[in-house]
């Protein structure tokens, strides 16, 4: 069947000549009845090259559906080419009787319909189409976007000139039929023709006014046409009197709030919104439209710029609370250390004009720009999970508010964009709003990015980009509503770029004229947005001067009243919380009460039942033969109760939690199989490639198990999982690094959110970081999770032995937990312990790659039952067997993790019987009481050695040394504490296998001999 090949972004990148030749060849293939003929590109074929080829496609598709839907000239053109074999390069040329009469026939007179020849001049029609297309693709270059008028592009693209198409002034009055490619929506509205002058004026109004759009990078014709249908209309938007009054009211609040703060606190940093106040009515319009379209939950992320304004006017934080924070009158209390006012989060059930309510959540954020982006999306995804909205994305959405410099420069922006369409991560589209004040602190855009627009990164995801002048409040409102409509229609990202300015410096104490004198001279003369809009409404007679004055006075009086009440305002830190956990221990309870611990063991019959479900394949499932062996061995270990390994223990932990009703989510690179082929949580049929997830087939009433291979991102994905963990305490959320070495790509999330989020923002999380760690001779990038860095983040004081009360509160008071276990049962209990509490804490697991299958790392099923739980340390088990009893031990080696296996093996091979080895399974919070009791059982010790695989400047030595000395002081014992491990090293590990082995032999000798 004859057809044109639809154009795409990829096709445009091909050489134009090749594309043209291909299209011409396709055009002249008359099904199977006529021999294919390829035409070389000729000078007269210019209308078939470049962007024009897109229109040939559009015209042809329209003609095939309904010949009368296109202009008579197109009808003649396609009929001549397809039915009469006329060359595409000749079919449109004058005169109507074409060359080579023996081959070509005249244009079908029945298609002319009484029009004169000018009416069917396809060349003219094509040129007008190209002109319209040029406005669609390049009109934004001429749009009046800069409120200050200092960054105006005076270089008009040649494609937007009449001369480019051979038109002259005399052609402006030429009548052009509207239709496909030339303002078709106007034709549908009843306008059949326009003069060329009217077409140009209409395109200028649509594409070069106070808003503009970039959409030609979108490969989907359906989506592109959606944009055209909303913009290429006689009136893209027109607000009623009442709607304008609402916009006016919302803008007045945004304007007055900033002016009030500037009046009362002129020397305080507030990172005001002056210059972009239009964002507030725009955001409110976006929220209202989204709610009308079915949204009931919105999670918002933004940096400092305008945050206080948004907190008050959109998320409805009481003004007196904000003023109280400026005053600094709040007393320190026991609910965390707090953060600056423009970092705090907030939750609010907001009513909308339609009568519906929406749950708004503004997440807390650090000053690390854009770091909150993936956090927001993770939280949205979690809400969608708990509301059964993961497939439709109709109820919950995210809004991210960016700064122009950060949006263009921060890599996490791209990582976050990259999640938008991934299974397990998609949230159905995010609305991105850029507060584009055309400066980054003191840096001009030309030094801050390498692209024309700060939003160009969004093109890689085919998101439409709407630019809008921040001084045109109604245009901002319209574009924000249009963004909501796009998200509703296509469930993909959309970008709103509000081009504005920053009236003051980066903060209000800064002097911006040092570096941007021209800009700030213009700003000094420029009226505020509220004044501009007020003047517009006065001219329209929408409002009177008296009404304007009354509105300003009303808002100011309310703010003044709030200011007075702020003097005695007592903060309720619950207003900070961006994730209230109803029915769960509050941050206050956590700080003041000793909460009970719950058992983590499970009935053996239950374990065996789960094990059978885990390792029994469905009938007819063709698993890989090696995998069958692995699954059979794991099943036998559970049924026999002997030799349970680490992966099996993990599966049992997940399975028992699922059966108890706790959602489990595991995410990271290659987690479905496991980096080390250890997990096999997702099984692949070798014949059909269908997948089977045993953990989702335990019982009808189990909770949901989700495991997803992530994109090759650490920062973005860990931020996403952290956000996911905030939504509910009733879930075990695990992020696993491919190797622990790569987790430092996400250091910002670890430092600013996971380790400090609860202390700063009362933002609680039980996220689990699973980090492969261990020196196995694989070199400096596959050996270390940088244990020392996590331990440095821990908030415990090593200088004093804790009181009994502090020991009971250890896990409540800690900021993170860090473990390095050596037994599968320990792994099992640690995972379950993280859920079986009335509070949540981050858990960092350093897991040994070599212990995943090591015979020494095995547990019996009895160690998983109700009588057992997690042990902070594991004492020596060989007393009276291969080594002497405790009273005869002279040397105690304390270690953590897989080095225990090497030490035990070397001790056995060298027949050493006077050295005991104690394993620290939990590094933080430290097992003070347990370690003191362990040391006390050795009365004749001569020395204590801390042994580790890591170099001296890495690992746990600097963490452990002061704690061991504090314990010895507490016990009243004076013993030397010695280090045995690798020497200091700039590189994490040796890349040479022989050097690795030599270093290991050396520190084992140091420890044992």
Swiss-Prot record:
Q: Where exactly is the transit peptide annotated in this entry? A: 1-39
Predominant subcellular localization, coarse grouping: mitochondrion
Q: Where does thiamine diphosphate bind?
A: 305, 404, 437, 439, 669
Q: Which domain of life is it from?
A: Eukaryota
Question: What modulates its activity?
Answer: Catabolite repressed.
Covalent S-S links between cysteines: none
* Cellular component, GO, one term: mitochondrial nucleoid
GO MF assignments = metal ion binding; oxoglutarate dehydrogenase (succinyl-transferring) activity; thiamine pyrophosphate binding
Q: Which InterPro entries match?
A: 2-oxogl_dehyd_N, 2oxoglutarate_DH_E1, DH_E1, KGD_C_sf, ODO-1/KGD_C, THDP-binding, Transketolase-like_Pyr-bd
Question: Which is a GO BP term held by this UniProt record?
Answer: tricarboxylic acid cycle
Give the subcellular location: Mitochondrion matrix
Q: Does the UniProt entry include the keyword Ion transport?
A: no
Named cofactor requirement(s): thiamine diphosphate; Mg(2+)
Q: Which UniProt keywords are present, listed alphabetically?
A: Magnesium, Metal-binding, Mitochondrion, Oxidoreductase, Thiamine pyrophosphate, Transit peptide, Tricarboxylic acid cycle
Q: E.C. number, please? A: 1.2.4.2
The main enzyme category here is: oxidoreductase
Main function: The 2-oxoglutarate dehydrogenase complex catalyzes the overall conversion of 2-oxoglutarate to succinyl-CoA and CO(2). It contains multiple copies of three enzymatic components: 2-oxoglutarate dehydrogenase (E1), dihydrolipoamide succinyltransferase (E2) and lipoamide dehydrogenase (E3).
Query: Which PANTHER family does the protein's record reference?
Result: 2-OXOADIPATE DEHYDROGENASE COMPLEX COMPONENT E1 (PTHR23152:SF4), 2-OXOGLUTARATE DEHYDROGENASE (PTHR23152)
What is the protein name for this chain?
2-oxoglutarate dehydrogenase, mitochondrial
User: What organism does this protein naturally occur in?
Assistant: Schizosaccharomyces pombe (strain 972 / ATCC 24843)
Q: What is the lineage of its organism?
A: Eukaryota, Fungi, Dikarya, Ascomycota, Taphrinomycotina
């Amino acid at each position: 069947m004859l057809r044109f090949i639809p154009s795409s972004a990829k096709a445009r990148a091909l050489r134009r000549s090749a594309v043209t030749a291909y299209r011409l060849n396709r055009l002249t293939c008359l099904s199977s009845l006529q021999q294919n003929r390829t035409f070389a590109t000729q000078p007269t074929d210019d209308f078939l090259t470049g962007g024009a080829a897109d229109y040939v496609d559009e015209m042809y598709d329209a003609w095939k559906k309904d010949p009368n839907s296109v202009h008579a000239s197109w009808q003649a053109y396609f009929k001549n080419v397809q039915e009469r074999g006329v060359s595409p390069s000749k079919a449109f040329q004058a005169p109507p009787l074409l060359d080579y009469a023996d081959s070509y026939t005249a244009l079908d007179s029945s298609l002319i319909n009484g029009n004169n020849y000018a009416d069917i001049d396809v060349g003219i029609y094509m040129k007008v189409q190209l002109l319209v297309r040029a406005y669609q693709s390049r009109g934004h270059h001429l749009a009046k976007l800069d409120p200050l008028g200092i960054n105006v592009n005076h270089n008009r693209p040649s494609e937007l000139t009449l001369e480019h198409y051979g038109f002259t002034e005399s052609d402006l009055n030429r009548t052009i039929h509207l239709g496909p490619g030339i303002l078709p929506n106007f034709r549908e509205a009843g306008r059949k023709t326009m003069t060329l002058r009217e077409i140009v004026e209409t395109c200028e109004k649509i594409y070069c006014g106070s808003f503009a759009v970039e959409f030609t990078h979108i490969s989907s014709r359906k989506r592109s046409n959606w944009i055209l249908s909303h913009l290429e209309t006689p009136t893209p938007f027109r607000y009623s009197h009442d709607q304008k009054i609402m916009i006016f009211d919302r803008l007045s609040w945004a304007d007055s709030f900033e002016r009030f703060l500037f009046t009362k606190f002129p020397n305080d940093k507030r990172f005001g919104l002056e210059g972009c106040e239009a964002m507030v009515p725009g955001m409110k319009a976006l929220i209202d439209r989204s709610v009308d379209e079915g949204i009931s939950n919105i999670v918002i992320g933004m940096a400092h710029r305008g945050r206080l304004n948004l907190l008050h006017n959109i998320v409805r934080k009481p003004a007196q609370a904000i003023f109280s924070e400026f005053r600094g009158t709040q007393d320190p209390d026991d609910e965390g250390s707090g953060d600056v006012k423009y970092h705090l989060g907030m939750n609010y059930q907001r009513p909308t004009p339609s009568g519906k309510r929406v749950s708004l959540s503004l997440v807390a954020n650090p000053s690390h720009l854009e770091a909150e982006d993936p956090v927001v999306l993770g939280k949205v995804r979690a809400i969608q999970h708990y509301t059964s909205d993961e497939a439709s994305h109709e109820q919950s959405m995210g809004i991210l508010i960016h700064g122009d410099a950060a949006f263009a420069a921060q890599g996490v922006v791209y990582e976050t964009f990259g999640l938008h369409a991934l299974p397990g991560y998609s949230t159905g589209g995010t609305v991105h709003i850029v507060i584009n004040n055309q400066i980054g602190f003191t840096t001009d855009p030309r030094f801050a990015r390498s692209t024309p627009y700060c939003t160009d990164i969004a093109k890689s995801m085919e998101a439409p980009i709407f630019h809008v002048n921040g001084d045109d409040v109604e245009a901002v409102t319209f574009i924000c509503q249009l963004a909501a409509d796009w998200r509703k229609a296509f469930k993909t990202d959309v970008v709103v770029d509000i081009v504005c300015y920053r009236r003051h410096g980066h903060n209000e104490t800064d002097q911006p004229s040092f570096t941007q004198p021209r800009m700030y001279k213009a700003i000094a003369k420029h009226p505020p947005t509220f004044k501009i809009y007020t003047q517009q409404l006065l001219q329209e007679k929408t409002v009177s001067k008296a009404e304007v004055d009354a509105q300003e006075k009303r808002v100011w009086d309310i703010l003044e009243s709030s200011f007075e009440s702020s003097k005695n305002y007592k903060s309720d830190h619950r207003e900070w919380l961006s994730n209230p956990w109803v029915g769960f221990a509050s941050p206050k309870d956590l700080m003041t009460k000793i909460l009970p611990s719950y058992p983590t063991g499970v009935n053996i019959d239950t374990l065996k039942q789960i094990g059978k479900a885990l390792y029994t394949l469905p009938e007819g499932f063709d698993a890989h033969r090696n995998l069958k062996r692995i699954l059979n061995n794991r099943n036998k270990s559970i049924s026999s109760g002997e030799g349970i390994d680490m992966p099996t223990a993990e599966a049992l932990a997940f399975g028992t939690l699922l059966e108890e009703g706790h959602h489990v989510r595991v995410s990271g690179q290659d987690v479905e199989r496991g980096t080390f082929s250890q997990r096999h949580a997702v099984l692949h049929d070798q014949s059909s490639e269908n997948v089977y997830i045993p953990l989702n087939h335990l019982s009808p009433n189990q909770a949901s198990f989700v495991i997803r291979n992530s994109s090759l991102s650490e920062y973005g994905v860990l931020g996403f999982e952290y956000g996911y963990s905030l939504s509910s305490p009733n879930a075990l959320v695990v992020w696993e690094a491919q190797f622990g070495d790569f987790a430092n790509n996400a250091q910002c999330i670890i430092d600013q959110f996971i380790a400090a989020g609860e202390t700063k923002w009362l933002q609680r999380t039980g996220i689990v970081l699973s980090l492969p760690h261990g020196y196995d001779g694989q070199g400096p990038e596959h050996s270390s999770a940088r244990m020392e860095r996590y331990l440095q983040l821990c908030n415990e004081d090593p200088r004093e032995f804790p009181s009994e009360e502090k020991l009971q509160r250890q896990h409540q008071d800690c900021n993170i937990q860090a473990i390095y276990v050596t037994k599968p049962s320990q792994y099992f209990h640690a995972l379950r312990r993280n859920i079986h509490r009335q509070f949540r804490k981050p858990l960092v697991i350093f897991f040994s790659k070599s212990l995943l299958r090591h015979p020494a790392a095995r547990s019996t099923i009895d160690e998983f039952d109700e009588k057992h739980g997690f042990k902070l340390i594991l004492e020596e088990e060989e007393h009276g067997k291969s080594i002497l009893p405790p009273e005869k031990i002279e040397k105690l080696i304390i270690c953590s993790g897989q080095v225990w296996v090497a030490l035990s093996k070397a001790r056995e091979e060298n027949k050493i019987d006077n050295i005991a080895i104690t394993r620290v399974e939990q590094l933080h919070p430290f097992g003070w009481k347990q370690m003191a009791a362990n040391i006390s059982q050795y009365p004749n010790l001569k020395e204590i050695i801390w042994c580790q695989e890591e170099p001296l400047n890495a690992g746990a030595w600097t963490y452990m040394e002061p704690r061991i000395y504090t314990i010895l002081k507490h016990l009243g014992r004076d013993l030397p504490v010695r280090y045995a491990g690798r020497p200091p090293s700039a590189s994490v590990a040796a890349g040479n296998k022989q050097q690795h082995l030599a270093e290991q032999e050396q520190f084992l000798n140091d420890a044992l001999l």
